[in-house]
């Protein structure tokens, strides 16, 4: 027998020797790895002369650092010294307070440094960067935001979080708050600039996300050379007392939400290096939001509002960037080329205000919500979201079919969501009379009082639903007709709408939904393999339940 530890979650397996050298998948975190050695259990350090807090006691607890993504036993966690004589850290540099493994604790349960000062702040034993206490206490859900340079990721992230912070307590009995203001200082500054500005009628602009810099990365010394790590945005998702599952499932609902926003250049081919691990978080993500900019695609520009000052910007090969992202996910996660990514991919079609009229897709601002008057509860309207995703997907198949194919070949669960961070066009700073589409690069901004975000919160809310944190319903419209001519092939249904000859292919995310046929403007129910018709409601369930988690028991 050999003892094997998953390199991601640390769970231990006892296997026969014949498994040595084979590639397997962890039943807990779905990480694929090759069994080629007999890993040693990580050494632990016993804390002596201590009166520890409750989580110092008991069995080991494994933690994933949100900075370097290495796992470690909580017994090995470092603390950040506070005495000024202890300035200088071998990993963070001369200006950082020294990190240390404590041997003494105060009566308050705080570590005591060499000079006798209480030290409440913890740090990763590998990268020495600060770890919030909530990362120790609560599980973490990681989401990555990817997009081309200048696609508006920073604006989208800021407005998305602003809307989500309002939407969750209002409709879903959740709060989303900062766990430590130092981690989210950039986002908080952006929110203040856009939504709490003392001069809301004056044009403002957010700075571009840089490849490096104190606001976006942390530089550490790793293996003798400097390495840049992205700064995570960390929030605590907690249910309110009015949440229907507060008493029965509070522990399952509470968690950290960790977001990463990289400069678009980080995802361009050739920008990956051992000195910059900015995109390694993709291997640990529970979902990806890919921001697709129609104004950086020459083919889609023909459908965009030509009066927008961003019209005819220099095109970017966003397909190549997507393939580079997918390649890194596979490489970092150990996913084979023939396998699909098992976490959801939400493609956010940004700046949709320039496409809304030409594409004829204009859902209500709150159309993604469904209210149950009897239960007095809100849920995501999965029927509406799926139908909008389908209509947008149909348009993209006419304009950029290769991108749709790439997205659905990469991930098992893909949605296409129209979003607009501003709800309208930005303004030209300092040159109001400059012609749109000019050759000179223009500085653009936005008037805070005119910001009307559209569906920016939906990608985030959809991720929460897909991971079992929000409820959803999928009741189709009355009079939806069945589809008679169809067949199932692997994870795809091939069909044609009644009275049409056009062939359609849809992945299983759309099965059971009532979708609008663009030719006759009628709704039709997409069949399911069991033939049960559309799902009447969808309780919030984890994606883990859709995955074969009994791998080890079957062998």
Give the positions of each predicted feature:
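Conserved G1/Walker A P-loop phosphate-binding module
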Residues: 59-62, 71-72, 79-91, 126, ...
